[in-house]
């Protein structure tokens, strides 16, 4: 339907797609024996735009893939110390997304690059979770964090492992292509270890069964996820998400693993001819450096799961100096956060070096790592922050060592005194 003869001698042209005449549209473009109107062109552009975003955004996220040095530099801005772990993570993540690029352009006969999931081992409060969160922010990819302790086998009360993929989809507005190239961080992975080496007659619904379910996700499977709205739309088809290219990072404190490592590395013989060795007390940092896959299996992880996490990064225990740095140096440091809160009241915050060291010592004594720093400082400032909104003329709050060690109230400097000084 390209043209029709009207009552007059001139021909009226019609769009070959929608059938509208040249008088009903703004523009009619001619081709070889066909015509297309501006409205049909706009409609085609809209259809193409609706179908492209997920793929194009996923490409954009990796088009400017940062180098390992750039990834580490970003991590340095948020995580103090842990140099070996940051270097290991930077290289592993860079290689993972480089592998995805290779897969898109690879031919049939090319070498197939396999995925390398990551295991982070380190004491509580050493920065495992923060490293994973910062990585995802650096790469601009979908990220979700899951707690392994809440996971159970399918059919039991608790979270199914496929709920992790649903949360990943939610984080990127249900764009399947983007989710398939995201990062999943599973915390407390050590808490789902087998309770014993011998299989029990009772079901271990939150231990080995969960490990088996996670294994399927890690090695790559088609996960069926309810569409947006879930049960509200029971007639909708389930979304199929391929987990082959999702990077899994697992983290855990692995309390007790150091004993397994020591038993392996310091095994001694029995009898009169055996060499007598005194067991030296080693720090967690030194012990974790010697970790081998067999130690993780002995600890309670199934061999198949250990095999799916070839990259192992160990995090060191934080020293007093490192904790002082964490208090002040990172972009979102605890001291900077409290300074910002008090600045909203028009008050300056001064924390003296002796107080910073006292906070670090207290956190070390509590064995909470960097996670305990905020609670210690908050506890010292809670009464002051309660009174500040109703107290006038306060210019500065000063926290010294006695505030932390002896629970004395911080020193308040008033505006008149500040002017005289």
From Swiss-Prot:
| Family designation | Belongs to the ClpX chaperone family.
* Species, as recorded: Polaromonas naphthalenivorans (strain CJ2)
Q: Where does Zn(2+) bind?
A: 15, 18, 37, 40
| Assembly mode | Component of the ClpX-ClpP complex. Forms a hexameric ring that, in the presence of ATP, binds to fourteen ClpP subunits assembled into a disk-like structure with a central cavity, resembling the structure of eukaryotic proteasomes.
Q: Signal sequence: where?
A: none
Q: What is this protein called?
A: ATP-dependent Clp protease ATP-binding subunit ClpX
Domain (ClpX-type ZB): residue spans on this chain:
3-56
Identify the keywords attached in UniProt to this record, alphabetized. ATP-binding, Chaperone, Metal-binding, Nucleotide-binding, Zinc
InterPro entries annotated for this entry?
A: AAA+_ATPase, ATP-dep_Clp_protease_ClpX, ATPase_AAA_core, Clp_ATPase_C, Clp_protease_ATP-bd_su_ClpX, ClpX_bact, P-loop_NTPase, Znf_CppX_C4
